[in-house]
Amino acid sequence: MSNEAGGGIHKLICLLCDSQFSQDVTWRALFLLKPDEKVCYSCRSKLKKITGHICPLCGRPQSVHAVCRDCEVWRTRIRDSLLLRQNRSVYTYNDMMKETLSRFKFRGDAEIINAFKSDFSSTFSKVYPDKHFVLVPIPLSKEREEERGFNQAHLLAECLDRPSHHPLIRLNNEKQSKKKKTERLLSECIFDTKNNSAEGMNIILIDDLYTTGATLHFAARCLLEKGKAASVSSFTLIRS
């Protein structure tokens, strides 16, 4: 089956639901080396990008453009000079993303990263167009990375055409996702770094999920206070 520009139908397998779907292939697309779609229409429609009003600090979707309650809590806990400058994310956290994230992180399906590469890269370029930022993926503990076989933050950082730096050391192996919200907000710092390891750098932390912001805020505090970074912002795949 062809269309006026030439070409035909290309059969593909969805990375999220494993079903077969079709993609129209034109000579123009082939000439421009347009990449294959990775996600079927049904799954793509369930991935909700963040639009509309957000918290200006953490990027949480909400009905008004105002600082959210979690960010107000962080302001009382950490000096403004040691806080994240801002966080921005691509998708909201819904049932579809919950299942996908579980496959990606906890069942070791690293190939799923390719389902998000295009949206992750294009959104990043819009939010952080300045080329002088340095990416710092959030590290896992050695044990966790060996168990999983990869670090999802590293894979996400590799989707972006920017230099990466790895100054952070993970101290605590306990999963932040297993803690209650109040425990995450009040837990001790879980990172360390060498003195002046990020001196003068404008850093963007990369991670998969922003919940309360505990992981990212503690990483920022470490890099600003001990690493002497000039600024720290963050970019995540999902904002819950």
UniProtKB/Swiss-Prot annotation:
Q: Which UniProt keywords apply?
A: Competence
Please name the SUPFAM superfamilies in this protein's record. PRTase-like
Q: Name one GO biological process term.
A: establishment of competence for transformation
Consequence of gene loss (knockout): 5-fold decrease in transformation efficiency.
Pfam families in the cross-refs: DZR_2
Question: What does the UniProt induction comment state?
Answer: Part of the comF operon, encoding comFA, comFB and comFC, transcribed in competence media (minimal salts plus glucose) once stationary phase is reached.
Family annotation (InterPro entries): ComF/GntX_DNA_util-trans, Competence_ComF, DZR_2, PRibTrfase_dom, PRTase-like
Please give the superkingdom of this protein's source: Bacteria
Q: What does this protein do?
A: Involved in transformation (genetic competence for DNA uptake).
**PANTHER family named among the record's database cross-references:** DNA UTILIZATION PROTEIN YHGH (PTHR47505:SF1)
Assembly, in brief, is: Monomer and dimer in solution. Interacts with ComFA and DprA; ComFA-ComFC form rings about 150 Angstroms in diameter with apparent 6-fold symmetry.
Similarity annotation: Belongs to the ComF/GntX family.
Name assigned to this protein: Competence protein ComFC
